[in-house]
Amino acid sequence: MKEKPTQYRLLGDENTSHKLVSACRHMVEEFSIVHIATWQGGSWLGLDDAALLISCAEAGLVLVAFDRATLPWHAGQVLRAGENHGGLMLFRRSVRSTDYGAQARLLTGFWTDEGRTWEWFNRIVYLPKTP
């Protein structure tokens, strides 16, 4: 079955576990997230970060990731090149990469409470948010 381009709003990158996607959908039925390996038949797997960020903007997707080291830098490079990215949500170091329940609670809570109404182009948010 083909995915509708507007069906999802969040894209879990290749270093984000499928278990996060499942946990989010368990907590919030029909939560608007898809993993990159299943989005459009996995055709986005292996894209360099800048190309992926630009592709996310074109598809209206916010990238969800753990890569705090390079993704913000790539997002800056995209902007300096005159392009847009679709937005970026990164988990802080305090969030364990294997604690899918905590990740899902942070992501679904933030998205449901406020994130889904935001304009995401060229925005970066770290979860958990600081007050």
Task: List PLM regions with ranges.
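A general structural signal for short secondary-structure boundary/capping elements
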Residues: S55-G60, T108-T112
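Active-site metal-coordination segments of metallo-dependent hydrolases
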Residues: L45-L47
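Acidic, PIN/NYN-like endoribonuclease modules and their adjacent C-terminal/linker elements
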Residues: E3-K4, Y8-E14, H18-Q40, A50, ...
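Flexible, charged surface loops at secondary-structure boundaries
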Residues: K2-P5, C56-E58
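Acidic, metal-binding active-site segment of PIN/NYN-like and related structure-specific nucleases
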Residues: D49, C56-A57, L61-V78
